[in-house]
Amino acid sequence: MTGDRELQALLRLTAWLSPAFPVGSFAYSGGLERAVADGLVTDAVSLAAWIGTLIGYGSVWNDAVLLAESHRWQAEPARLFEIAALAEALAGSRERHQETMLLGDAFLTAARAWPDGVFERLPDKAAYPVAVGAVTGAHGIGPEKALAVFLHAYASQAVSSGIRLGVTGQRDGVAVLAGLEECITEVARRAAASTLDDLGSATVQADIAGLRHETQATRLFRS
C-alpha cells in the first residue's frame, strides 16, 4: 500500500508539472527573450549559464524557497496568506508579477481535478510557487521531490524558449537540460531546508532584462 501511495504521488507530481498541464507556461520566457535580443544569451553554453544562475541565485531560487515554505505550512491558512503576499511583493516587474499570478491561477484551477481542502486554505489568487508548494504538500509529496521536478520543469521550459528564440537547436537543448541535473538536485536539496531568511537574488542583468522586455517592440513571449 505504501508503494501504491508513492506511485500515486509520483503520477500526480508528474502530471502537475508536465508541459501538458494547462498553465500556459509556454507563453513566458522570464526575460530570456530580452536577454537574447541584448546579446546576453547567444548559444547553448550561455543559455545553460543563464538558466543555472537563475536557479541557483535568481528569481527561480526565490520561487524554490517560497515553494518550500508553502509546502511546510500548507495546513495553516494564515501562514499561506502571508507567504502569498510576500511572493507577490518579490515580483520584480509588472510582467513577472503577471506571469507568476496567472500561472498560479491556472495551476490551481487545473489541480482542482484532485479535490483537497488545501484549495480553501489558499488565497483566491496565489503566485505559482506558492500554489505548487501548498498543493504538493497537501498531497503528501516530499518537498525535495516537489522542488526537483518544479526546477526541472522551469529549466525545460527555458530550454524550449531558447530553441524557439533560435539560440540553440533541439539536440544541444537536450544537452543543456542534461547538464543542469546536478544544479537542479543541489538547489532542490538546499531549498528543501531553506526558510524565508534565505530569500535573495544576485542576478541584476536578468532582472533588468525582465524590465526591458516590457517595452520590447517585437516579441514571442509575454515576459
Swiss-Prot record:
UniProt xrefs under InterPro entries: UreF (IPR002639), UreF_sf (IPR038277)
UniProt entry tagged with the keyword Cell inner membrane: no
Keyword entries, A-Z: Chaperone, Cytoplasm, Nickel insertion
GO molecular function, one term: nickel cation binding
Subcellular location: Cytoplasm
This protein's record includes keyword Nucleus: no
Any one cellular-component term (Gene Ontology): cytoplasm
Principal location: cytoplasm
Superkingdom in the source lineage: Bacteria
UniProt subunit comment: UreD, UreF and UreG form a complex that acts as a GTP-hydrolysis-dependent molecular chaperone, activating the urease apoprotein by helping to assemble the nickel containing metallocenter of UreC. The UreE protein probably delivers the nickel.
Record-linked HAMAP family: UreF
Function comment: Required for maturation of urease via the functional incorporation of the urease nickel metallocenter.
Family (UniProt): Belongs to the UreF family.
Protein name in UniProt: Urease accessory protein UreF
Lineage of producing organism: Bacteria, Pseudomonadati, Pseudomonadota, Alphaproteobacteria, Hyphomicrobiales
Gene name for this UniProt entry: ureF
